[in-house]
Structure formats: C-alpha cells, structure tokens
C-alpha cells in the first residue's frame, strides 16, 4: 500500500546564508533526483514553513510501500549523499514519520467485517 515518508528538520544555525542556499541547491539538484530513481519511489517534494528557508522544512517522499524506505537507505547513490545531508541538519530538531494510504482494502483488512 502507498506509504508517505515525512522528514522534518531545520538547517544548523551555524550555517551562513550562502551555505543554506548551497544546501538547498544540493537537495534539489542532487538528492531529489537520486531519491526519485530508487525503485518504488513515486515522488519527492520539499517544503518550507515560516522559517525563511532555514527552518520548519519538510521532505515528503511518496512510495509504493513501506519497503521503499529500506530501498532508499540501501541505494548506493542515495547513501553517498546522506553524509552531507545530515551534516547540514540540526538533528536535535529533526523528526520523521510514516503514513500509509487509507484504502478500501485496508479498511476491510482492519475491520471485523472482512
């Protein structure tokens, strides 16, 4: 079933404005295309809240199923990029969640009506 992986974060306060801009370019030009190539990934979108592109950032990755997350972590291209990604993030404020799509099949599977 379709799964939505959500990652929230702020960039580190120690980054200059130029470094933040460079990280956005890196995310958009290198990370997002690499993620989109992983089998089972439907899309990746990046959003910013009221944090002036420095904070309240959300990455949404829609996948065919929850196993897509493991495929992301095991993908050689994505793994090469993760070190830089995590270096720029304030991991103390970062969060993640998984959401499964509610479908009639899921409701039937979870209900006693079969």
Please provide the spans of the model-predicted regions.
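Short S/T/G/P-rich N-terminal loop/turn motif that feeds into the first structured element of a domain
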Residues: 1-56, 64-74, 92-114
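A common structural junction motif
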Residues: 77-83, 89
């Amino acid at each position: 079933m379709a799964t939505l992986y959500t990652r929230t974060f702020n960039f580190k306060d120690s980054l200059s404005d130029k470094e933040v801009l460079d990280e956005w370019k890196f995310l958009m030009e290198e990370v997002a295309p690499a993620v989109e190539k992983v089998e089972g990934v439907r899309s990746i979108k990046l959003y910013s809240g009221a944090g002036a592109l420095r904070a309240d950032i959300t990455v949404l990755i829609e996948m065919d199923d929850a196993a897509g997350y493991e495929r992301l972590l095991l993908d050689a291209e994505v793994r090469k990029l993760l070190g830089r990604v995590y270096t720029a993030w304030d991991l103390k404020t970062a969060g993640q969640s998984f959401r499964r799509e509610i479908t009639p099949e899921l409701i039937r599977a979870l209900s006693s009506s079969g």
